[in-house]
Structures are given as structure tokens and as C-alpha cells.
Amino acid sequence: MTKRTSFNPLVIGVTLFFILLLMAMIFIAPEQTQALLNQAKSGIFANFSWFYVLTFSVFLGFLLILSVSSLGNIKLGQDEEEPEFSFLSWLAMLFAAGMGVGLMFFGVAEPLTHYLSDITAGSAEHKQQEALLHTLFHWGIHAWAVYGTIALALAYFGFRYKLPLALRSCFYPLLKDRINGKIGDAIDVMALLATLFGIITTLGFGSSQLGAGLEQIGWISQNSFALQVGVIVVVMCLAVFSAISGVGKGVKILSEINLTLAFCLLLFVLISGPTLYLLSAFSDNIGNYFSNLVQLSFKTYAYEQEHTSWFSGWTVLYWAWWCSWAPFVGLFIARISKGRTIREFIFGVLVIPSLFGILWFTVFGNTAVWLNDGIAAGGLGEFISSPEILLFKFLNYLPLPTITGFVSLLVILLFFITSADSGIYVLNNIASRDKSLASPAWQAIMWGTLMSVVAIVLMQSGGLANLQTMTLIVALPFALLMLVMCFSLWKGLIADKKYFSTKVNPTSIFWSGDKWKSHLEQMMNQTQEKDILRFLKNTALPAMRELRQELTGKYNLSVEINTLFEQEEPALELVIHKESMRDFMYGIKSVGREVSEQLINDENLPHIQHSATYEPYTYFFDGRVGYDVQYMDQDELIADMLKQYERYLSLLDDVGQELMAHEQTELAE
């Protein structure tokens, strides 16, 4: 029977109360509410800009430290797990995550705006270089550091600790089971509000740019507020339809088509613009960005008060926007990164999208400045106060403006729809009590309606500035929460490293010498799955039964044997139950591996006749790498099980191993 709702009542209740309170204030006292929002924005700019700057630098430094330390070897999953996607496919999906409405909106607008502002000085060439530097700083590694931090925490605790893929799970080392209580609910409320306003801000940018594009290609006479409302409603209806109708595969195909169109647009501008100059600028921009990265990472313009307004209106607002988008992008990255090592994960997340961002802004930004100073004769710069229209004005100076304008509109529209569709999924995930269950259709409709109404009301009362202000306000406590998350992740990783570094014999082959002939006979016969099944039934199962009888009869322990002979990899498990701690589990499964054709055809190895060989490998409750036990007899298997049980008991007695030994299955509720 389908549940009426998957919502956590407290989380959704507090979130809706905050939203409805804000809407009521805007309707009842619009001027006072606007003044209050402006005051809050000014207060954050004046008192917390330094906090945003240092926080983002901490996120980046934290990831870099993990990547170069031994903790970077830890897998996001069990030790034997392989990545779900190939390396190239994974990089392609990270590349896709780096695309969005923001690049279309700011690709031309931001570099040109910085170029024409007083934040840059000197010759035209130096101003252009500085303009690109500031743009790349806003869209580069720092943005991906905040995404990577939350994605790493989600993936690590989700795949390594087997916890739900939820924000509250990231605080397990600090809170243990309390993540299921009121503190966990408070974490979800903060994440929900931050994500909600981050997505709504993107809706505002997308709707204004779509309206401007429709006006430019002549489909409408004016980009009015009413038109933008219509765009939001239509796009949200399409996103809700996608979310509730099970056309996810179709949306995935649309996303891939959209990425192709965006890349084609990029190539078109590169080829039709000053190609050689852009390629040279790309190299120059990379070098200039990385050589100035440390200084910019900590720059608050404390000694350049004349630029603090620019700093607040650009850098601080961007940092708040990235914080609000972190759960959204982080959850996507976490879901596709199972089986990667932490080092590999950090390299991919920080480098690949950032390099693409540098390429995008080089092609669009440098070309925009080149056009403005050349054939446009300053004509593009006249529109910097209306950034939503700049992309289309820019395309008018290149060949085929009608076609490229239409393609740009299509790309923005599809990014808009897929972002809203994914946003509904993420909001449902954060607000749900059980993350593993599908949410009923009415919840998608509710989120679509709520996002549309809030976006429209805020835009009507104060335009895009109000959307940015709300993002700035809700992102501040979430940024603080993410700092605590870093500490929690560090604590979990240290416990993980200590636990898995506990020495245990890597192999359990008992080469005592008195059975060498029988061992040699086994080695000279290529074992097949039927041989492993015989070993499990005739040797391993009697050994487990004998040990169970001793443990239950003499020591009154709760012991269970699971016979899993019918599954794809036949297996056998001995489980000793413990209250409040992880159960001890000693399993043996049939593991197959391919044999080289050269070995099969080698006349000196007549015993190798099959294309695959099978071995009985152990596996454990904590995901440690197992070992081959095919040469053990019944007594030796019992001795090996007791050796692993002794290790388990010693870890339970060690206070430092409490985190890894604590039972976590109830957290999946």
C-alpha cells in the first residue's frame, strides 16, 4: 500500500511555516518587509563577508589535505567495490554537472561587467585579464570545493557506513543515533531552506533570460514581468510532469541533447570569433587564475574600501548561492561516485568542471570584450545593466544570429526544466522521513507550486535582488553547518583509517607441512563453481554448525547460519548477534575470475582447461578485503573464524573503534 506522504512532519512543517510567514509579511507589509530584507542583506555584507571568504577557503583546503594524505586512499564504498561508472563516463557526468542556466546567463555578462567597472584598471589588455580573473575565481575551484565537500560527506557515509544518502547522515560521527531526532530534523530544515531558495534564484535568472531571448528573436514585443511569470509556470508544469509521469529516461536523453547543443554553441563562438586569440587567452587565463588563487581566496578588500560594494555584490553573493546549491549538486555527484577513492573523487570534482568553466568564460567572455571594443564600438557595454539580454545582443554580432539565438533559447529552456525536475527530487529527498521510498505524486506538485509562487512573489516585490537576498540569508547558517560537517567527516575518516589498519593475517592458508600433498593436488586442479559449492556444503557448513553449537550451548550467544547457495555467487554466513553493536559476520562466497587464454593453451599447464576459475573468499560485516580459504579443513576454518571473532571483540573493547563498531542499521528508517 502506497503511503499518503513520505514527508517528515516536523521538517516540512517548520519549512512551510517559514515560507508562509515570509509570504504573509510581503503581502501584509511589503514596504516594511523590503526594508527588513535590505537591512538583513546589508548586515550580512558588513559583518559576515569575511566568514564566507574564510569558510570557502577552509572547504578547499580541507579537500586538498584529504587528497594528498593517506586518507585519500579510502574508497567511497566497501574495499572490494568497483566504480559503478567507467572513469570517462564519470568525468562526462561531472562535466554535465558543471553546466547550467548560470553559465548561459553570466557567460557574456559577468566578464564584460567587470571589464567596464572600476574593479579593473590599467590598459585595456590588463582590464580584460583582470575581468576574466575575477569571473573565473567566482566560477572555479571554490564553487566546486563546496559542492565536493558535501558530496564527499554524503558518498562516504552513504556508501561506506551504509547510512541513508541524506544530509543528517553526514553528522553521524558526532551525533550517532541522535541524527534521527530533533537535531537531525533541524539539519534537514536548514538544508531544505538553503536548497529551496538556491533553486528559486536560478528560476528567476532563467525566466528573465528566456523572456529576453523571446523578445530578441521577435516572438514577443516586451520582456514583461507577466511574461516571466508565464515562463516560470510553464517550465514548472513541465518539470512536475516529468517528475510524476516516470519519463526520467526521456529527461536524461534531453539533458544529453542539451549538453551537445551547448557544446556546439561553444564551438560556434570559438570558430566564428577570434579563434587563435581565444586559444591563447585560454592558456593565459589558466595560468593567471592559478597564480592568483591563494591571494583571491582570502581577499576581503579590507584595505580597498572603495571596492567593498563590488565585493559584496559579486563574491559574497556567489558564495551564498553556491552554498545553497551544494545539497542539490552534491547529492547528484555523490550518487554517481560510488567505488571511487577519495583522492580520485577530489581530483575529478575540483579539476574537470573548473577547467570547463575556464574554457566557457574564455570563449564567451573574451569574445564579448573583443566585440565590444571592436565592431560593436561599445554597443554591448550599454546593456550591462540588463544582463539577461546580453547573450542575445552578443550573438547579433556573430554570423547566423537568429539560429544561434534560437539554439540558446532551447538550451536555457532545457537547462531550466531539468534543473527544476532535479530540484523537486532533491527537495523531496531532504524532506522525506524514509529516503529509500518513492514520494507520492502530489508532493512533486506541491514543490512545483511552492517554488513558482515564492519565485513570483519575491520577483514582484523586489526582482532578482530579493531572490539573491533570501539566498544570502538562508545560506549563512548552512555554511556554518558545513564547517561542522567537515569536522564530522574528518572524525569518521580517522576512525576508518585506524579501524582498517588494525593488523590481521592477510591469508589463512595453513601451510603446516603435513598436508602438502593434498594441497598440491588441489592446486593442480582448476576449481569450478561446483567444487566451491561442494566445499561450502561439506567443509564450511559443518564447521559453522560445530562452532554455533559451542557458542550457543556453552556461552548462550545468539548465532545464526545463512545458507545462500541459490544466489548468483553461492555463499555461507555465520552471524553472531550483538545488541546495539554491529553483528559479527564471517561469510564465504564463490568468487570467479577469468583465466588468460595463453595459460589455457600452455602445454606446460595441462591442469588449466577452463576460461574461468573459482575460489571461496571470505567477507566480513565491515567490508574488509577477504581471502581464499579453499585449502582449509573443518578445524582450520573454525580456527580462522575464531581469529576473526577475537579481532572483532578486541575492537569492541577499544573506545577508539566505537564509531566503526556501532550498529547503524536502524538509521535507515
UniProtKB/Swiss-Prot annotation:
Pfam families: BCCT (PF02028). It is found in: Cell inner membrane. The chain crosses the membrane at residues 9-29, 48-68, 87-107, 139-159, 186-206, 224-244, 259-279, 314-334, 345-365, 397-417, 444-464, 470-490. Keywords: Cell inner membrane, Cell membrane, Membrane, Transmembrane, Transmembrane helix, Transport. It is a multi-pass membrane protein. One of its GO terms (molecular function) is transmembrane transporter activity. It comes from the Bacteria. One of its GO terms (cellular component) is plasma membrane. Belongs to the BCCT transporter (TC 2.A.15) family. NCBIfam families: bcct (TIGR00842). This is Uncharacterized transporter HI_1706. The lineage of its organism: Bacteria, Pseudomonadati, Pseudomonadota, Gammaproteobacteria, Pasteurellales.
